Amino acid sequence: GLHKLKIKCPMPIKNKKGSYLFKIKKKQACIVTFLDGKDKSELTAKDCYVVGKNIGKLHKASKKLKIFRKNSMSINSWGPLLNKIDNRINKVSKNLKNSMKHDLNDIKQKWPKNLPKGIIHGDLFIDNIFFYKRKFLGYIDFYFSCNDFLAYELAICINALCFKKTNSSFIFDKKKSTNLIRGYESVRKLNGNEKKYFNVLCRGSALRYLLTRAYDYLNTPKNAIIKIKDPKEYIKKLNFHRQVKSYNNYIN
């Protein structure tokens, strides 16, 4: 797997029966090695370069793996998910349901068809990136890992890592975004089409997380152990991507 290809991540371990995958209480499970370090509360621009570089390494190394998994949260899943979100979501933001519907239709029309694909992590939020003594240590939580557009991974990271929260606003940090892309391109260059469609990939990623957060907001029991994440964060991020049109808006 990835660990043998020198990608910094936990390594799967076989159980006593020699299987990597098995079931616990009818759910799929696996055992992995422990990864030292922990996540940071906020990444610096320098950290973003290192993260980008290691995403590039992941994408390059994963070409050698002959495994395939469809993205269960790809653009084709967003419509059915939107249909499950009822009008109560408009309490979060006025006319939100219609706004998401409009965004989805527009993004679907503009969504690319032939960008370079490969294995992506698919959920690289700050709590899945580990550091030890300020040094990058590796990635965890490959639950959403799948085959998809490689540039879509960067779009997810732009949304997850390159906005600064100030009060109730989320301000785009172009320095972090630039470093993330530069770090990535130190290993793998983006081609012209990936740059051309970069904005729509960022919009799509923001909508995907807005949809899942909106659904969870309405359907997670109030006494659930998991913390419900605020959909408003991704309303604001989606607004930013609507206002910009070009790859140059993401890089200095």
Language model: regions and residue ranges:
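ATP-binding pocket architecture of kinase catalytic cores
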Residues: 1-67
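Structured catalytic core of nucleotide-sugar glycosyltransferases
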Residues: 5, 9-13, 19-22, 30, ...
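Active-site acidic catalytic loop and adjacent metal/ATP-binding pocket
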Residues: 12, 105-152
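A glycine-centered beta->alpha junction motif in the catalytic cores
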Residues: 29-42, 83-87, 207-224
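A cross-family kinase active-site recognition segment
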Residues: 42-95, 117, 225
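Active-site activation/catalytic loop segments of kinase-like enzymes and analogous catalytic loops
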Residues: 151-189, 204-221
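All-alpha amphipathic helical-bundle segments outside canonical DNA-binding/catalytic cores
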Residues: 192-202
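ATP/Mg2+ or Mg2+-diphosphate-binding catalytic cores
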Residues: 209-252
